[in-house]
């Protein structure tokens, strides 16, 4: 059951990430908060998150994130928090970069996270 609400947020991010988030969610400076957990938005009853530029953290030789990239844990933690808060509601993560989508998808599968749908949508 979706019982969340839109809240104003002041997030630190690049202008490109902010623009992409607005492209995906239709909102600017707002987040959907469901059971205390932030999502970038909600559309047609689906909880959504927008992921911008991560390809600089991907080792082109291995096709995985660099070992020094600490954002891996943050992505996993965010996914687990969102899955719990969604309580069975569908979740979609939109990616601005196809290579990032593939790396995150592999990371999640390795960790047994399969509840999030991955969608590639190029920035406008």
Q: PLM ranges: what are they?
A:
Residues 1-124:
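Catalytic toxin/effector domains delivered as secreted proteins or via bacterial secretion systems
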């Amino acid at each position: 059951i979706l019982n969340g609400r839109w809240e104003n947020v002041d997030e630190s991010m690049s202008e490109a990430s902010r623009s992409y988030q607005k492209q995906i969610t239709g909102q600017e400076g707002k987040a959907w908060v469901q059971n205390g957990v932030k999502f970038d938005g909600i559309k047609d009853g689906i909880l959504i998150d927008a992921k911008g530029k991560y390809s600089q953290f991907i080792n082109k030789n291995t096709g995985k994130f660099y070992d020094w990239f600490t954002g891996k844990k943050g992505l996993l933690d965010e996914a687990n928090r969102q899955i719990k808060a969604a309580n069975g509601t569908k979740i979609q993560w939109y990616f601005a970069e196809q290579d990032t989508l593939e790396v995150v998808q592999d990371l999640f599968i390795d960790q047994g996270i399969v509840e999030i749908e991955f969608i590639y949508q190029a920035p406008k």
